[in-house]
Amino acid sequence: MGKVQLTKIESYNNIDMIQTSINSMLDNSLLSKKLFDGAKVVIKTNLLMKKKPEQAVTTHPIIIECLANYFVKYNCEVIIADSPAGPFTKTSLEGIYEASGMVKAAQNSGATLNY
């Protein structure tokens, strides 16, 4: 039987608690860290539209940043990616990634964006 892990996070401002929770969840998963070294990892966000994190429409960038941090720690090439509704152009993606906080998440974690 599989495991479920829950952690109550009061605020997205507590990045240390979020990072610890994500690390614990992934460390306790069935993923083999032997697969990670040098692997390419794509983190698929849920960017429905050009909205700020405070509007709670898209995946919060702190969650994406912490996931990216985890895989970067294992020498992975991390790409934050999505294909929101509308035209798939660099200009469109840049606007959505900037508004949603994904540009900062990528910069902070060492990940890249898919454009």
Role assignments for model-derived ranges:
Residues 1-115:
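N-terminal and secondary-structure boundary signal
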